[in-house]
């Protein structure tokens, strides 16, 4: 989060965030946009990546409140250029966030690179945040996009949680839900280890498995969630088959802390509820 915030606030231009499905990329971006909400920043959030270069420019211009309908690519570029220079003169920051950016065509990524040419001697007029899965890394490493790759000022990768981070995430979410301190016993260490074994620390799966396990335990009038209920939930969610194809990462222990990400995700969901 700190790296993304720094990249935007310091107007570094291109920033890339990658991670596997369900690791919390989109929620992390939502938290970032909330942090930027009161900092003279306006953003366009692009969700649909199956766009042509003209459609992308049209979408971005519309998100920034510009009249875009029926205009040519040249006209859209002129309008965006004037808009960005005007905001820069007022010391305002403009951001384009592209979600699922691995789906962008080479043509559109090149168009985005050309947008980054709009700059002063010291700063980029447009901050571009590319968010995507592992395939985005592969695409950025391709020969066709070597110029774009060189312009990326910051590049971050979001890993799944390790066991300790999974434990912290579960307990943090229990606190956010209003559970008393003794509610830690709802998920004993053995149960959390079972959750981790089935989910491999993927935040979305951790949340889904825990929610379903709590419902199952409640239906059986249990005061805590035993490991066998987690096993049953994992079976119902077809996670056992998933784990057979992708062996458990129980021995994986990374140096990057995902706990802060978990807290951001949990706080975001709590704020949304």
Question: Where are the regions a protein language model picked out?
Answer:
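Walker A/P-loop nucleotide-binding motif
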Residues: 10-32, 49
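Short regulatory helix/loop adjacent to the ATP-binding pocket of P-loop NTPases
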Residues: 33-36, 136-151, 160
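C-terminal alpha-helical "lid" subdomain
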Residues: 176-273
């Amino acid at each position: 989060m700190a790296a993304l915030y720094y990249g935007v606030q310091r107007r570094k231009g291109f920033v890339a965030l990658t991670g596997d499905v369900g690791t919390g990329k989109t929620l992390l971006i939502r938290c970032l946009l909330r942090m930027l909400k009161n900092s003279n920043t306006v953003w366009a959030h692009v969700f649909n990546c199956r766009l042509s270069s003209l459609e992308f420019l049209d979408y971005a211009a519309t998100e920034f409140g510009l009249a875009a309908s029926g205009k040519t690519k040249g006209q859209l570029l002129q309008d965006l250029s004037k808009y960005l220079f005007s905001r820069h003169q007022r010391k305002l920051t403009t951001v384009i966030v592209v979600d699922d950016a691995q789906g962008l065509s080479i043509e559109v990524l090149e168009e985005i690179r050309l947008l980054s040419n709009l700059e002063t001697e010291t700063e980029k007029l447009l901050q571009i945040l590319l968010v995507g899965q592992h395939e985005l890394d592969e695409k950025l490493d391709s020969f066709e996009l070597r110029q774009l790759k060189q312009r990326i000022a910051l590049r971050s990768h979001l890993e799944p949680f390790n066991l300790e981070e999974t434990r912290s995430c579960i307990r943090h979410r229990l606190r956010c839900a209003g559970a008393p301190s003794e509610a830690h016993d709802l998920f004993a260490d053995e149960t959390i280890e079972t959750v981790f074994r089935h989910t491999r620390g993927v935040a979305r799966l951790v949340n889904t498995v825990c929610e379903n396990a709590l419902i199952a335990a409640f239906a059986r009038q249990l005061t805590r969630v035993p490991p066998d209920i987690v096993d049953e939930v994992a079976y119902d969610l077809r996670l056992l088959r998933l784990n057979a194809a992708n062996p458990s990462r129980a021995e994986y222990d990374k140096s990057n802390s995902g706990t802060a990400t978990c807290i951001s995700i949990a706080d975001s969901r709590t704020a949304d509820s």
